[in-house]
Structures are given as C-alpha cells and as structure tokens.
C-alpha cells in the first residue's frame, strides 16, 4: 500500500467521519427537541457500557453541550458488574482522556445472576432489573435530573417486534419515560439514529469497544432473529424501516383493537330521518 493511497483513504475517512458526526448530531438534537429530553440546568447521567452506542451517545452529547443554547451538565457512569475478563482499565483511561466527570460503580451482579438463574435460562430480566436499580439509586444520590441510555432506532423497532411476536403486546421503547418509582426521568437521545450509522461512526472514531460476555441468553437470541429479519427487509425493501418507524410515531387508536385506548362503547351512528339525509349536499359530507 503506497503512501499516496494511505493518504487518500485517510482523507475519505475524515470526510465520512465529518458527515456522520453532522448527521448524528442533527438526529440527536431533533430527538432532544421533539421530546424535550434535556432542559436548561439539567444534570445528565450518561450510562456507559463500553459498547459502540453508549460511546457515540456520550461523544455527541458532549459535542452538543458546547454549542447548545441551554446550559446542562454531562457525567459518565459505568456499572462494573464483575463479569469475568472485563477490562477495568479501558473506560477510566478513555474518560480521563476526555476530561469528563465520570464514576465507575462496582457491584457483583454477575455472581447474583449466575446463582439465581438456572443454566440455560434467560439472564436478561434479572440482570437488567439489578442494573436498573443500581443506576437509578446512583442518579438520585448524585442529583442527576436525567438518565441517558444508548438505545437507537433499531433497538426501538426490534423491541416492538419482540413484544409483538413473543409477548402479544404492541410495545416498544419510549424516547423518554418516568421510572416506575417516579424518581427518575430516562431519555434515549439516539432514538432517531440508525445502528449502521452509529457503528460506522464508532469505527472511524476508534472507540475502545468492550464486548459483553454475560449475554447470549434466549431473549437475546430472539432479538438477534428479529434484528436479522429487519436487516433483510432493509436490504430488499429500501425505506421500509423508515416507514415502520414513522408508523410508531403516528398511531390511530380508533383503528386498532385496544378498548383501553379508545372508547368504542360511545360510538353512535348519526341519527337522522331519511328526508333530512336527502337534503344534505354530497359535497358537504
């Protein structure tokens, strides 16, 4: 590989990185505005797992913080669950290089999950509940007003189909929600971002990605099947995923079958005598 070729490739990567940064920043900014995710004076706790999504989220939020018309704080928090082989030095070194305020919470949830869940059974439910409780408590203790998670548009659509196929519910991931205990507001700034854009951005930014060794349970295998289905649709039917995501934002309860969302009992036909009906102009109907 010649020096000229290397230089040309580096230039292409720089241009692509700049394009992706602008795209992701625009989509994150749009999501923040649409759902009022971050307000003036907020203290945002950015949950960092070591994966591409949370790295990209932190990177974009720090970038937006410099240019936003409002003032808000960003802190990074990682939960070290004591998984075997977890490289404990990676995140502290990276976050120190950024100069961002960060915390590493050490809790051995790995042993708890392994002790409570039989071999071969899904660990995701218990693991996520333990992780959620620890992070929620930390946010309250440190007076964080928002908890930012790195779920993106693909995660939202996968969750929708996961719940439809296996749970019989039309339920996805909301871009913003109040925790069950009412103490925290959770936001997903990457809600409008495509995973393939985040993945390419993370590669160009050379984030020190940490793989998760605990997962691989049944729920994640089901999610992987749905991910492959959506990826196949994206290749064969361009624009389908975009339309499906728009559908999640454009729900008509009167055209579904949930009596909790729409009061079908109160539907009444228009009461009118035949003579009166004939007098109405068709153009006015």
Curated annotation (Swiss-Prot):
Its EC number is 2.8.1.-. One of its GO terms (cellular component) is cytoplasm. CDD domains: TtcA-like (cd24138). It is an enzyme of class 2 (transferase). It is found in: Cytoplasm. GO terms for molecular function: 4 iron, 4 sulfur cluster binding; ATP binding; magnesium ion binding; sulfurtransferase activity; tRNA binding. It comes from the Bacteria. NCBIfam families: PRK10696.1 (NF007972). This is tRNA-cytidine(32) 2-sulfurtransferase.
